[in-house]
Amino acid sequence: MLVIHDRIEPQAEWAAELHLNFEARSKSRLRCFSAENEDVGLFLQRGQSPLRDGEFLQAQDGRVVRVCARPEKLMHVTCSSTFELTRAAYHLGNRHVALQVGDGWLRLLDDYVLKAMLDQLGATVETIEAPFQPEHGAYGGGHHHSRAGEEDFNYPPRMHQFGVRK
């Protein structure tokens, strides 16, 4: 098994490639197969951004591995005006949808409920097969309810925390 722990700077040459969809690139722990059909175990540092197309990893045995975003079924969204596209992005953002933003278009994973919403908003939705590279997010850490790392966020008590008085 090819065991991988480290992300590295871009390299001119590599020994293997991993062709992964967005969900697989978002995991820090993953068992998969390389394009060369070798068993691979990813053990990356937790809490990091998803792997990106063209990123490089180093295996324990020293080999360099290139990450490739595998094409997947996406919705390609366009609108007749910038306002309508912005409105579509706003509504998708309210649903915490992973979203790839381009010049005059949006892309998201195929979902019939979101397609119905976009249709109601007047967007043009086309189903395509393409690599998915969504925005990582403004705060980088993702949305979670874990208490891990809580000491980094020392906020004053809120009004509705029972038993807390000023």
From Swiss-Prot:
Pfam families for the chain: UreE_C, UreE_N
GO CC field: cytoplasm
BP-aspect Gene Ontology terms: protein folding; protein-containing complex assembly; urea metabolic process
Coiled-coil features, chain-numbered ranges:
none
Where is it chiefly localized?
cytoplasm
Sequence segments annotated as region (Disordered): 135-154
- Location within or outside the cell: Cytoplasm
Keywords attached to this Swiss-Prot or TrEMBL record, sorted alphabetically, are: Chaperone, Cytoplasm, Nickel, Nickel insertion
The molecular function terms of the Gene Ontology recorded here are:
nickel cation binding; unfolded protein binding
General function of this protein: Involved in urease metallocenter assembly. Binds nickel. Probably functions as a nickel donor during metallocenter assembly.
Q: Which family does it belong to?
A: Belongs to the UreE family.
Its name, as the record gives it, is Urease accessory protein UreE 2
Q: Which organism is it from?
A: Pseudomonas syringae pv. syringae (strain B728a)
> What gene name is given for the protein in this entry?
ureE2
